[in-house]
Every structure is written in structure tokens, then in C-alpha cells.
Amino acid sequence: MSANGSSVAQLLWQPPVCRSWKPDVEGAVYHLANCFLLMGFMAGSGVYGCFYLFGILGPGYLCCVLWGWFDACGLDIVLWNVLLTVACLLQLAQLVYRVRVNTLPEEFNLLYRTLCLPLQVPLQVYKEIVHCCHEQVLTLATEQTYAVEGETPINRLSLLLSGRVRVSQDGQFLHYIFPYQFMDSPEWESLHPSEEGTFQVTLTAETECSYISWPRKNLYLLLNRERYISRLFSALLGYDISEKLYTLNDKLFAKFGLRFDIRLPSLYHVLSPSASDGEPESEKDDEEALEAAVSPAQARPICIVPTPPCSAPPATTNFPVPLPRARMPRMPRPDSGNLASRRPLQNSSQVMSRSQAPLAPIHTPEL
């Protein structure tokens, strides 16, 4: 035991005895190999760090092979460095294969950066969502209909990637659908998985459009299997439907100067054109009900008389209850400027500032 300890101590504390040192240094290939190795071991993490690591170590070990073959003349040096060079090349090939497999088409890559990356959706989860739509991008020509009211069945969920889609009912324009908005989110939420239904609106492409579509059955299976994806779609669909409701509310404000409760079930009839002499009595009754709701607010301005500071107010004095302040109008989208001009918006805001209008008509026409 003592002999082994003494031999280890000699190896550690006594320098190796060299019979003779080389009078000259190694060749340029040897120093080039060490430079490659030094730069390679300074690589970072991640996929690109691995590309850098094995891309630099491979040439470094190859230079060691050349040095061992031409200068050192050692078979063991050549064999070990050949093995290390092959290992680096295999790692590079495996990295290239993984990158090619995980690469998405340009449309889906842009969709991920726009819609899912701000929500910190993992890329693997996004790939499952894309795989559910078979990674297909569908197109619509100008004035081509995506759905016809009363005819097209609700059997899919689609997301617009580019272009603009017009939504109408009975020929009456309702709102637009812009890129990265769902095209049929209200229809999707209106049905249970076991129910069948048809579109109540017509969707027409105003420009050349591209979109992706999930089959209804496949998407329901994915949502039932993956709870995270189900919550993600619930949040996205809820936000999309609220945006559509606010778009309708903005159009009402541009037309009447009023902001109605978005929970009303008959906004479509309020959006219909003004009643004329030749229209049916039902539409005239709708207009009269709307005027009856607006006229009291405009005929009774709010006036508060200040009370002298010395006299105490009587016990039975009823102070006027302030009405809720109307919300400021939402800014229209860049492509939907023709929904309302700036002049009606300004006039409507002045009317709202002078007299507070009710949130909704008193008598709402039924569908």
C-alpha cells in the first residue's frame, strides 16, 4: 500500500523526466487544430449553439488527424481523432434532420408568431393544432362565398390568414372579418358537439383570401383530449366573438349616435335601413320605438341648480341621479373606414356630451 502511495506521489510532485526536448515546435496543422478546438468549446446553448459546437470541433479533429498522419506519425492519434470527427459529423446530420422535420410552412410560421407566440404557446402544442387541420391553406377568390345563410352546414372552424371577408344577412352588411380572426366563431359556439345547424349569415370574400380550416369532428376530439388546447381555443374564440360584437356596436354608434347594450338579441333589426313609406308596418314600429327611446333623453337636459352655502338642504330634497357616462367610440379598423365617416362620429359625440342617452332602446324589436 505504501509503495502504491509513493508512486502516485512521485507522479504528482515530480516532473516527468524527458530524455530530450524537441528543438522545434509542432507544425501549423497542429496549432490550427488546437485553435479550432478552443473556439468550439466556447459555443453556447440551444440548437444554434450545437450547430456551432459540432461545426467547429469537426474541422479541429480533422486537423488532428492530419497532424497525427503527417507529423506525429502515430496510429493511435489518427484513429482517435478519426472517431471524434465522425461523431461530430453524425451530430450535425442529426441536428439538420431535426430542424427540417420541425420546420413549418411560411403561413403557419407567421400565424404562430402573430397569434400564439404572444400567448407563450409551446411550439409542440402549436404543431398538434396545425396537424389537426392537415397543414392545408385554403383560398377564396374575390366575391366567392365561404358560407350562405340557411344553406351551408356548420361543420368546421376557420381562421382567416389574409384578405378581407364581408358578413351580411338578407343582403344587409353587418361587419368585416380581418386577418387572424375566426370566420365562423359565433356559429361554432352556438352549437353543442352533438347538434347540427346551418349558417345564419353569408360570408363573401371581398379580396383574394387564404384561410385554414379545422374539421368539426377532429377539432372536438383534440379539445377533449388536450385540456390546454381546449382552454386556448376558449380564450381565442371568446375574444374573437367580443370583437365582432363591438364592431356591431360601433356601427350602431355611427348610425344613431347611441351605444346599445351588446347583449340585445335583435341588433340586426336595429341595423336595418330607415323605414320609408312603402315599408311594412313592423319596420315602422321598430323605428318609432327607437325614436321614443331617444327623444326623452334629448328633451330633458340635466340641470343642477346650486344651493346657497348658508341654507341647509331640506330633508325631502331629491338630488338628480347622474346617468352613467357613455363610453368613447372605439377606433375603426384601417380597412373598414367606409363603415362610418368622421363627421357623424363627431356630431354624435357632441350629442352624447350634451345629454346622456340610454344604453338601449326601451322597446327592443323582436327577431
From Swiss-Prot:
<dbReference type="InterPro" id="IPR014710">
    <property type="entry name" value="RmlC-like_jellyroll"/>
</dbReference>
<comment type="similarity">
    <text>Belongs to the popeye family.</text>
</comment>
<dbReference type="GO" id="GO:0042391">
    <property type="term" value="P:regulation of membrane potential"/>
</dbReference>
<feature type="transmembrane region" description="Helical">
    <location>
        <begin position="36"/>
        <end position="56"/>
    </location>
</feature>
<keyword id="KW-0547">Nucleotide-binding</keyword>
<keyword id="KW-0812">Transmembrane</keyword>
<keyword id="KW-1003">Cell membrane</keyword>
<keyword id="KW-0114">cAMP</keyword>
<keyword id="KW-0116">cAMP-binding</keyword>
<feature type="glycosylation site" description="N-linked (GlcNAc...) asparagine">
    <location>
        <position position="4"/>
    </location>
</feature>
<feature type="modified residue" description="Phosphothreonine">
    <location>
        <position position="364"/>
    </location>
</feature>
<feature type="compositionally biased region" description="Acidic residues">
    <location>
        <begin position="278"/>
        <end position="290"/>
    </location>
</feature>
<feature type="transmembrane region" description="Helical">
    <location>
        <begin position="77"/>
        <end position="97"/>
    </location>
</feature>
<feature type="region of interest" description="Disordered">
    <location>
        <begin position="273"/>
        <end position="292"/>
    </location>
</feature>
<comment type="function">
    <text>Important for the maintenance of cardiac function. Plays a regulatory function in heart rate dynamics mediated, at least in part, through cAMP-binding and, probably, by increasing cell surface expression of the potassium channel KCNK2 and enhancing current density.</text>
</comment>
<keyword id="KW-0325">Glycoprotein</keyword>
<feature type="region of interest" description="Disordered">
    <location>
        <begin position="312"/>
        <end position="367"/>
    </location>
</feature>
<dbReference type="GO" id="GO:0030552">
    <property type="term" value="F:cAMP binding"/>
</dbReference>
<dbReference type="GO" id="GO:0060931">
    <property type="term" value="P:sinoatrial node cell development"/>
</dbReference>
<dbReference type="InterPro" id="IPR018490">
    <property type="entry name" value="cNMP-bd_dom_sf"/>
</dbReference>
<dbReference type="InterPro" id="IPR006916">
    <property type="entry name" value="POPDC1-3"/>
</dbReference>
<feature type="glycosylation site" description="N-linked (GlcNAc...) asparagine">
    <location>
        <position position="347"/>
    </location>
</feature>
<dbReference type="InterPro" id="IPR055272">
    <property type="entry name" value="POPDC1-3_dom"/>
</dbReference>
<dbReference type="Pfam" id="PF04831">
    <property type="entry name" value="POPDC1-3"/>
</dbReference>
<dbReference type="GO" id="GO:0002027">
    <property type="term" value="P:regulation of heart rate"/>
</dbReference>
<keyword id="KW-1133">Transmembrane helix</keyword>
<dbReference type="GO" id="GO:0042383">
    <property type="term" value="C:sarcolemma"/>
</dbReference>
<keyword id="KW-0597">Phosphoprotein</keyword>
<protein>
    <recommendedName>
        <fullName>Popeye domain-containing protein 2</fullName>
    </recommendedName>
</protein>
<feature type="compositionally biased region" description="Polar residues">
    <location>
        <begin position="344"/>
        <end position="356"/>
    </location>
</feature>
<dbReference type="GO" id="GO:0016020">
    <property type="term" value="C:membrane"/>
</dbReference>
<keyword id="KW-0472">Membrane</keyword>
